[in-house]
């Protein structure tokens, strides 16, 4: 909002000045419009520079946390902990501490919200993923209403929340936001949705989702799940082959807890 306001003022002042100085309305209008766009560009570059500095701070926190987790893993290999659960709790604490630090850093974007109307929705989308990792689903639901859903992860989180709340818009959201994905993203999204439909005993919808995804992906898990459904082996449907990508959605817990020690940090 401020960007447009300041640009309009700068353009108007420049237009008036050059109209008077050059005694030409045409040149005055041209210079005014040029000043407007140049002002917008300079403000955008300034915001990008400031945002870049914050992003580097966030990346530093993530890298430090990953390094600490790696050191713990090496330590566990040398001196195994008393139980896998204890090791998992230590790793999750490292992850959660990093997530909370990242959320604090996200607040540094706030002063620039008034300069870029899309920035709040972009940062909210980032916070959605962070709060989801912390399993603070109430905050996730609140932020999803004010987020820009551009990346696959955020869209899948919304799909999960719609499923968990038995929201009737689940099918519409999947068809409008996730059916056009290709490759691994498309395969994973289709298998997540199909898993939900199997749980709801809507097998035809599950098969239809996988058939559509097969046109854009030859992912092994996708093909295996399609064969299971085609042969009516509904209880054998499994997304375990996607590993942590699947378990990080919290729809299922891994059968072997140790698998999650390698969970992706963010």
PLM-predicted stretches and their roles:
Residues 94-95, 115-192:
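Alpha-helical adaptor scaffolds
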């Amino acid at each position: 909002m401020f960007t447009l306001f300041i640009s309009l003022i700068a353009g108007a002042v420049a237009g008036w000045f050059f109209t008077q100085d050059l005694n030409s309305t045409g040149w005055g209008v041209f210079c005014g419009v040029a000043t407007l766009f140049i002002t917008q560009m300079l403000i955008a570059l300034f915001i990008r520079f400031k945002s870049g500095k914050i992003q580097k701070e966030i990346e530093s926190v993530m890298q430090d946390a990953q390094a600490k987790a790696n050191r713990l893993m090496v330590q566990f290999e040398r001196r195994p902990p008393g139980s896998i659960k204890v090791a998992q709790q230590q790793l999750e604490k490292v992850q959660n501490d990093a997530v909370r630090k990242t959320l604090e850093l996200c607040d540094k974007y706030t002063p620039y919200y008034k300069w870029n109307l899309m920035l709040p929705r972009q940062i909210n989308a980032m916070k959605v993923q962070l709060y989801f990792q912390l399993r603070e689903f109430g905050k996730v639901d609140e932020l999803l209403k004010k987020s820009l859903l551009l990346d696959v992860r955020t869209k899948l989180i919304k799909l999960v929340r719609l499923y968990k709340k038995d929201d009737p818009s689940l099918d519409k959201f999947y068809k409008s936001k996730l059916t056009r994905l290709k490759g691994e993203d498309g395969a994973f999204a289709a298998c997540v949705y199909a898993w939900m439909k199997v749980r709801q005993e809507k097998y035809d919808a599950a098969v239809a989702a996988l058939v559509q995804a097969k046109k854009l992906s030859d992912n092994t898990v996708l093909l295996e799940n399609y064969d299971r459904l085609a042969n009516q082996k509904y209880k054998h449907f499994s997304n375990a082959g996607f590993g942590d990508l699947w378990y990080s959605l919290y729809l299922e817990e891994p059968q072997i807890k140790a698998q999650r020690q390698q969970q992706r940090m963010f």
